[in-house]
Structure formats: C-alpha cells, structure tokens
Curated annotation (Swiss-Prot):
Function: Responds to activation by environmental stress by phosphorylating downstream targets.
GO BP terms in the entry: intracellular signal transduction; pheromone-dependent signal transduction involved in conjugation with cellular fusion
Active-site residues, record numbering mapped to chain: 140 (proton acceptor)
Protein name per its UniProtKB record: Mitogen-activated protein kinase CPK1
InterPro entries noted in UniProt: Kinase-like_dom_sf (IPR011009), MAP_kinase (IPR050117), MAP_kinase_CS (IPR003527), Prot_kinase_dom (IPR000719), Protein_kinase_ATP_BS (IPR017441), Ser/Thr_kinase_AS (IPR008271)
Record-listed Phosphothreonine modification sites: 181
Keyword Kinase: yes
Encoding gene, per UniProt annotation: CPK1
C-alpha cells in the first residue's frame, strides 16, 4: 500500500516511495518506504524540532551519533534528505534501516523462550559495548528502543538522550545543575542513582536498564512499573531491600539520604522468586546488573563474558567503536546561550554534510 505523500506532507525526493506510517512521537513521524533505485526498504523519520530547544538538542545528538557509529547492533543512518535552502528548512528527514518491530511489541504479543532472551540480551550488550567504548551513555534503554526484524536481529535506536560520560571541558557550563542534566528517560528503567541524584551518572546506568529489560522478557511484564517517583523507588527497594551502609554512603545527596532514612526497613528478595521462569544463569545476571550501588554493578565487558550469553559470546567479534572526536559534544555545554536560530543553523549544517552509504553511492553511480 502506498500512502498519499501530500496527505502527510512528506517532502522527500521521488527516489523514495512511501508505503505506511509505522510510528509517531512527540516531535516526529516514521514512515516505511522503499529507495526505488536500489530497492532498499527504509524507515524515513520526519522530525520537526524547531519549536523547542530541547528537541533541537536531541535531534542534533541523534544525527551526530548515528553518523559516528557503524555497528550491527546500532541502527544506522542511510541518508539525510537535504533541504532546498535554509529558509525552507523546517523539518529534518532521517533515512534509516527498516526494522519490522521492537522488543516492547514482541514482549506484549508472545512469551519469549530462554534462547530468545539470551540472544536479545547478548545483542543489546554487544551494541552497548560499542557505545561505552566511545564513552557514550545511551541513558534511555528500554524495550521500545530495541528494534527487531524477522531474523531476530536487534538494533539499539533513539539516541536523543545519549551523552558523553567524559567530563565537561574546563571553563564550560552544563547549566549549573550537576553533570548530566535534562534527564527525562522512561522512569521504569531508571537506575537508583538517577532517581536519587548521585553526583555523576556512569556507564552503569545502562546496565541497570539491561537488567530491567531481561527481567521483563522473562516475566512478560515490566519489573518496576512505577506510577510516580516515590512508587518507583518503593518498587526498587521492595526487591533490592534497604541499602547497606556501604551503598548508603555512596549517595552524595543529603536530601536523598534523609528520604531513605525515613522509609521502613525492607528485606532483599531473591530474583529466583521474582522471576520464577529464569534459569540460574539468568538469575545471576539479574543480580549483577540490578545492584543498588553503581560501583558494584557489572560492566558491559563483564556482562558479555557472563555464562548466560556464553552461547553467543565471541571476543573477536564484539568490536569497539572509534573514539569521538574532541569537541563532539561541545554544543551541550553552551546550550543555555544558544538561540533557536543558532540550533537550527547547526542542524542545517549537519544535514548538509552527505552520508556516505550504499544509498547515496547507488544514487550517484546510476
């Protein structure tokens, strides 16, 4: 089925045939289509970010990061549709690989076998290793951001909240609210240190999300479906128990310490009781990813060597990514001073830079 291009106001070249709407978000629409010259099936994401600075930031992050990473378990950018001029530049069109579904939909529609859980966790960790090797935190890992196709290939998507874990350059500001501001990721997959405002977030926040995703695949429902901030923390503590003194002392926020002190003591629950279908190796991986203290949490490299994913682990085929160039995230540290027009100009310049992919090469050579 071909949709009417004028109906949805998609300004893309005639080299693309639009077929169906496959997703809609706060500031974007995703349409499945075909790149006619090559016959490649694609997803075209139309983003309209210029009404809000936050959307501009996310869009610029996403384009820059998708351009940087070339990895089997990270969604790739195939093309950026170039606008006719800066004056008519009101939308961004990102062309990506078309994936048939996502893990959220799969979990809701069927019970996953342990083999599926292993393979999906392994691929998530493999993609995450590439991100972390470049000092990038995803910060919003959740089932709907893990795209899947019929072969069970998994790709991490949505880098709008991703940030560098490197320290801000000297003499720059991150808004004065502590390292890592503007955190609005889905509450259910947020690590305790995010909830309790530890001074800095580390790569460990993504491993917490992996643990939540594994438990959700095993149980068929979210592990910590908090209704609000207080309920979310309560659900986490019902499972992990009251923090030990060592864990408690890692918290840098006095307000968070006072909040925890006021709560009733709770005993730790066993993950084998919470996830009764889980194999012993899965239970062990849950224990090591879902720790209260980020310093005690397993790293992505350690998780790839865990017995739960040993059927897939191949140290020679789990590549690191190229390091980010110095200044890659510089725009983050001047965000308060930038006008909307300056954001627009930066995104325009990024879009003007061609993406060297199969699609662009095909179009140029034919």
């Amino acid at each position: 089925m071909t949709i009417d291009q004028s109906q949805i106001n998609f300004n893309v070249p005639s080299t693309y045939k639009l077929e169906e709407i496959v997703g809609e978000g706060a500031y974007g629409l995703v349409v499945a289509g075909t790149h006619l010259p090559s016959g490649t099936q694609v997803a075209i994401k139309r983003i309209t970010p210029f009404d809000h600075t936050m959307f501009c930031q996310r869009t610029l992050r996403e384009i820059k990061l998708l351009r940087h990473f070339h990895h089997e378990n990270i969604i790739s950018i195939l093309d950026l549709i170039q606008p006719e001029s800066y004056e008519v530049f009101n939308e961004v069109y990102l062309v990506q690989e078309l994936m048939e579904t996502d893990l959220h939909r799969v979990i809701r529609s069927q019970e996953l076998s342990d083999d599926h859980c292993q393979y999906f966790v392994y691929q998530t960790l493999r993609g995450l290793k590439a991100l972390h090797s470049a000092d990038v935190l995803h910060r919003d890992l959740k089932p709907s951001n893990l795209l899947l196709n019929a072969n069970c290939d998994l790709k991490i998507c949505d880098f709008g909240l991703a940030r560098s874990s490197a320290k801000p350059p000297p003499g720059t500001s991150d808004g004065g609210q502590g390292f890592m501001t503007e955190y609005v990721a889905t509450r259910w997959y947020r690590a305790p240190e995010v909830m309790l405002s530890f001074q800095e977030y580390t790569k460990a926040i993504d491993l917490w999300s992996v643990g939540c995703i594994l438990a959700e695949m095993i149980n068929g429902k979210p592990l910590f479906p908090g209704r609000d901030y207080h309920h979310q923390l309560s659900l986490i503590l019902q499972v992990l128990g009251t923090p030990t003194m060592d864990d408690f002392n890692e918290i840098t926020s006095q307000r968070s310490k006072d909040y925890l002190r006021a709560l009733e003591f709770t005993r730790r629950q066993d993950f084998s009781a919470i996830c009764p279908k889980a194999k012993p190796a899965a239970v062990d991986l849950l224990k090591q990813t879902l720790t209260f203290s980020p310093s005690k949490r397993i790293t992505v490299e350690e998780a790839l060597m865990h017995s739960y994913v040993e059927a897939y682990h191949d140290p020679h085929d789990e590549p690191n990514a190229e390091p980010l160039k110095p200044g890659f995230f510089d725009f983050e540290f001047h965000q308060e001073k930038l006008s909307r027009d300056q954001w627009k100009r930066m995104i325009y310049d990024e879009v003007q830079d061609p993406v060297p992919t199969i699609l662009s090469q095909w179009t140029e050579s034919h």
